[in-house]
């Protein structure tokens, strides 16, 4: 199913354990509904039992926040798909409004967090390589990403201040670069 495919893409990504548990409960609920509609469906009892066991075997979420570009994009797509399922109430398992909102906020913040770690690492690498224009792009991306969160989340506010300092370093480097080009052309 679509839900099983989402779960299959989760290993190694920082998806909150609550999201995986919710999706596994949804699979269980769908199997129970199938059993009610088709009680003689071959193997349904075993499928339900396997789904129940899977709920109890959800592992804590990955602590990994330093994702390479492809994994970051995969994580971003996956978390947006889960958020969409929650927002559009596509799950068979009932989810209260407060739990839905908490989980969607947690998924969104996790996207911001992983993107921040990726972008700051890329910007630092580019600064060391004197690729300041590319580093400036990452700075701009991070400012846009973090600014909305910086007002309501202390961690994001700290990251935002760190990004502003990094942007200042890049800007100073670009000014120095422009001045040295200007003086060498005289």
Q: Which positions does each model-derived feature cover?
A:
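N-terminal topogenic membrane-targeting module
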Residues: 1-70
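Inward-facing hydrophobic residues that define packing positions of alpha-helical scaffold repeats
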Residues: 24-27, 79-82, 86, 127, ...
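Short, charge-rich, low-complexity alpha-helical interaction segments
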Residues: 70-103
């Amino acid at each position: 199913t679509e839900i099983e495919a989402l779960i299959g893409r989760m290993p190694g990504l920082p998806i909150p354990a609550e999201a995986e548990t919710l999706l596994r409960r949804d699979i269980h609920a769908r199997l129970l509904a199938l059993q009610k509609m088709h009680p003689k469906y071959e193997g349904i009892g075993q499928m339900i039992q396997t789904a129940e066991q899977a709920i109890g075997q959800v592992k804590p979420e990955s602590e990994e926040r330093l994702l390479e570009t492809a994994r970051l994009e995969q994580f971003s797509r996956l978390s947006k798909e889960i958020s969409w399922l929650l927002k559009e109430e596509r799950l068979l398992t009932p989810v209260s409004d407060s739990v839905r909102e908490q989980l969607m906020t947690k998924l969104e913040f996790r996207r911001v967090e992983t993107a921040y770690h990726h972008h700051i690492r890329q910007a630092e690498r580019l600064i060391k390589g004197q690729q300041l224009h590319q580093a400036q792009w990452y700075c701009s991306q991070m400012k846009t990403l973090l600014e909305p969160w910086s007002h309501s989340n202390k961690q994001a506010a700290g990251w935002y201040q760190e990004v502003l300092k990094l942007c200042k370093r890049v800007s100073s480097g670009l000014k120095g670069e422009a001045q040295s080009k200007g003086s060498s052309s005289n």
